[in-house]
């Protein structure tokens, strides 16, 4: 398994697949693990439909679909935008376990994120809060919930305190640093916001949202030429969403 992992991490997918094929014949646990890793390779190769078909067929062939394998499957579906199907699986897990089970906060988080992605915010918020109630020190769950609140323009002071905690738990994480800076921006603490957003853009120089945020805070601090540079840069990033690009085009004309 370790050798296959090394091949996978170095993008040597042909050799990795050969090892996974051998492993798949060594019992159900290896059968599932091999399929999951092969599905990840298909995703890397841009074969999403093939990946989803493989992992779904494998899951359905298992004689025992235990909660850990079901969680793996749900997470894979969520990460590949099959949100409704992942919600069903997370719900299946949550119904089978108690609040003190180690999978409980993870399943609640996973389902909460999936709900948020399909626009079911009330259900998402409830699940994310429930996840943190069961396990309060999950930095990424704190970040997801707090950033969602900030984007909705609610509970910004509370979000800032939560993000300060998340930053203490996971120092130097660019996503958390960006969220922290964005909370300060929304509170009109522009100098403080610039400190964090500059750190975030240094850690994640190709992230569209981080660059957009940094452009905004530069503008508010009077650095308008630099702001336009960062906004323009986002327009050239392949993974920048069209809504973000349209918003930036407006800012390049009108400013903030």
Segments predicted by a language model, with ranges:
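Terminal, low-structured helical/coil segments at or just beyond the last alpha-helical repeat
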Residues: 213, 220-256
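Short coil turns that delineate tetratricopeptide repeat
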Residues: 28-29, 63-64, 98, 102, ...
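Register position in tetratricopeptide repeats
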Residues: 9, 44, 79, 110-113, ...
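Canonical tetratricopeptide repeat
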Residues: 2, 37, 72, 110, ...
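TPR alpha-solenoid repeat register
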Residues: 33-34, 69, 103, 107, ...
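Residue-level recognition of tetratricopeptide repeat
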Residues: 5, 40, 75, 113, ...
């Amino acid at each position: 398994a370790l050798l296959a992992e090394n091949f996978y991490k170095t993008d040597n997918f042909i050799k990795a697949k050969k090892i996974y094929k051998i492993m798949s014949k060594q019992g159900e646990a290896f059968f599932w693990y091999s399929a999951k890793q092969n599905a990840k390779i298909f995703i890397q190769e841009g074969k999403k439909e093939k990946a989803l078909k493989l992992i779904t067929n494998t899951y359905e062939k298992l004689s025992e679909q235990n909660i850990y394998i079901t969680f793996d499957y749900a997470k894979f579906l969520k990460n590949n935008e099959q949100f409704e199907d992942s919600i069903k699986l997370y719900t299946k897990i949550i119904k089978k376990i108690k609040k003190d089970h180690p999978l409980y906060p993870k399943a609640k988080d996973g389902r909460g994120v999936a709900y948020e992605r399909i626009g079911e915010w009330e259900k998402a918020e409830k699940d994310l809060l429930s996840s943190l109630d069961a396990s309060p020190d999950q930095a990424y769950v704190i970040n997801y919930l707090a950033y969602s609140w900030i984007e909705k323009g609610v509970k910004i002071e509370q979000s800032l305190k939560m993000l300060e905690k998340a930053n203490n738990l996971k120092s130097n994480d660019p996503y958390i640093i960006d969220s922290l800076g964005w909370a300060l921006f929304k509170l009109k603490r522009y100098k403080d916001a610039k400190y964090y957003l500059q750190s975030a853009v240094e850690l994640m120089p190709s992230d569209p949202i981080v660059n957009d945020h940094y452009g905004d805070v530069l503008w508010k601090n009077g650095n308008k030429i630099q702001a336009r540079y960062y906004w323009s840069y986002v327009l050239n990033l392949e993974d920048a969403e069209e809504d973000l690009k349209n918003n930036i085009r407006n800012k390049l004309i009108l400013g903030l």
